[in-house]
Amino acid sequence: MKMSLVLVGSILIVNGGNLPSSSADSQHVPHQVSSHTSGDKSQHKRMAIIIDDVGNNMKGTAEILATPVKLTVAVMPFLQTTKKDAIAAHEKGMDVIVHMPMEPKKGRPEWLGPGAITSNLTDEEVRDRVEKAIDDVPYAIGMNNHMGSKITSDKRIMSIVLDVCQERGLFFVDSRTNFRSVVGELAVTKGMPPVGNDIFLDDHNSKQRIRKQMDLAAQRALDKDVCVVIGHVGHTGMNTSAVVHESVSRLKGQIEFVGIGDLVRDVWHWKPELKLPTDNK
């Protein structure tokens, strides 16, 4: 059966269900000090901007792909422009990661889109879905969670997700949609980089709010040497892309905009061999 995904107003509809953004699941990222500082205070102040929800021809996608600095696009698997958007981002020199749909604490699983990780799956089913998602997103070097406040606090499931990522040479970015997330501690025990989101840019759809969040992110990068932020295409896409473009120009010379892969390699020295299918390179 063909799955129908359309944009109605500001929300994706998947077989009649809504597909909200990760920030809608989280509301706020917990204020905590992350382990992103490398100790070399002479290094550039760096910011990695991850743009979620790419892969379904969403508002702001073209504008994000036209950004004149290196961004990271988190592409949802199995959607109408998954491969097109991932390839376009890669060809522009951006990093590509899998935006893995995961069950939230609140909301129906069918809101998530195809191939979602839900709490009723067996170990084998979790592994199979993660493998297939990686296979579906060309040039993916990592993964983060779409929504997932329920799953990222589940040690059984997240252990399997991280195992598959590690086996395939991918890192996992915790979007931090739940302050009880176990992703960071599991990553450390598995020898993987405990990288996570510091600030959501567009928890409210206004340029004023997004600018304020970008200012907070810039200050964090200046204070801590690095900052990881997440924005979205779709409902907030046009405002987010506009503010990102403004900020790139305004912060030039103060902050270097890098892909998340650059931070993972430089800060955590993560340099595994990617194991991708032959048609996904």
Features from the language model and the residues they span:
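C-terminal domain-boundary segment and adjacent tail
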Residues: 165-178, 236-281
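N-terminal pre-catalytic segment of deacetylase/amide-hydrolase enzymes
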Residues: 11-49, 55-63, 265
